[in-house]
Amino acid sequence: PVPVVVLDPVMIASSGDRLLQAEAEQALRDLVPLVNVITPNIPELAVLCQKEPAQTFDEAHEQAANLAAATGTTVIVKGGHLCGQDAGNTAVFPDGTCAHVRTPRLDSRNTHGTGCSLSSSLATRLGVELLQHTEAAEHTAEQGVLTSEDTHRALQWSTRWLHESIAAGAGLQVGSGEG
């Protein structure tokens, strides 16, 4: 199988703090077409698109669809930064189609690092999906090709895992800071 590359553009923390110098933003934009999937949070998506941060899912979806179409890269819209009961994630594919994975919003302060965790989980599951897809295809033209269905299944698994992890973390009561 060919490598699967997931880029988590760690540019802006949930607190709003910038983690990447503005001069490096174009370099990160230049990387996007070279990866399979990118997992920006809402403020990072806005920086990549050179727009204001989305306030609604529809605005985030529009930004992601434009970025995906322009780069040929699947963009994951992470619902954790948006309002509403659904904190799910959506894969927006370069052809404009999307696959949403619903998950209820949890009332938790234990969310520091969940974006990185989602990206790592997604990268792992995409590798599993690609391996299973490749084995099922045996030696056909589809061998080694990551499909939108593979990405959707990996996102379902990763979203469920992250939701369960956040829920389980609520009872730990460790540390004293945010997250």
Q: Where would I find each of the regions flagged by the language model?
A:
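Conserved phosphate/ATP/ADP-binding segment of small-molecule kinases
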Residues: 22-98, 107, 126-152
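Short glycine/threonine-rich catalytic loop with a Thr-x-Gly-x-Asp
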Residues: 105-122
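Short glycine- and Lys/Arg-enriched binding-loop motifs that mark or flank ligand-binding interfaces
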Residues: 75, 109-111, 171-173
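Solvent-exposed, amphipathic alpha-helical segments
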Residues: 117, 121-132, 161-168
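Glycine/small-residue-rich loop that forms an oxyanion/phosphate-binding "nest" at active or ligand-binding sites
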Residues: 1-30
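A structural signal for small-residue-enriched, beta-sheet-centric alpha/beta enzyme cores
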Residues: 99-109, 159-160, 164
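Charged C-terminal helix
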Residues: 134-179
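Short acidic, glycine/serine/threonine-rich loops at helix termini
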Residues: 16-18, 86-90, 167-168
